[in-house]
Amino acid sequence: MSKAPVVFAIVVVLFFVELNAGGLPKSFLEALKMAKGDKVAESFIYKNRNDCMTNCKLLPTCPRLAPECCPTKTPECPK
């Protein structure tokens, strides 16, 4: 059995993870570090980030979770 497909799949996954992590704001990544691998906390952080993009008044931490959208929307804020 060839190992090439397995190696290719690993490279694709690593590239995808690196691409996504590079696009996230530093303050959001710091919030994830504070969760320290707690899957429930991480899911809340991601959900709150998505919700903050459309409603900055949802949480007092919205400017940290989605700084490209709160308090003012920039062109980088997803529509």
Swiss-Prot record:
Expressed by the venom gland. GO terms for cellular component: extracellular region. Keywords: Disulfide bond, Secreted, Signal, Toxin. It comes from the Eukaryota. Its main location: secreted. GO terms for molecular function: toxin activity. It is found in: Secreted. Residues 1-21 form the signal peptide. Contains 3 disulfide bonds. Belongs to the scoloptoxin-10 family. This is U-scoloptoxin(10)-Cw2a.
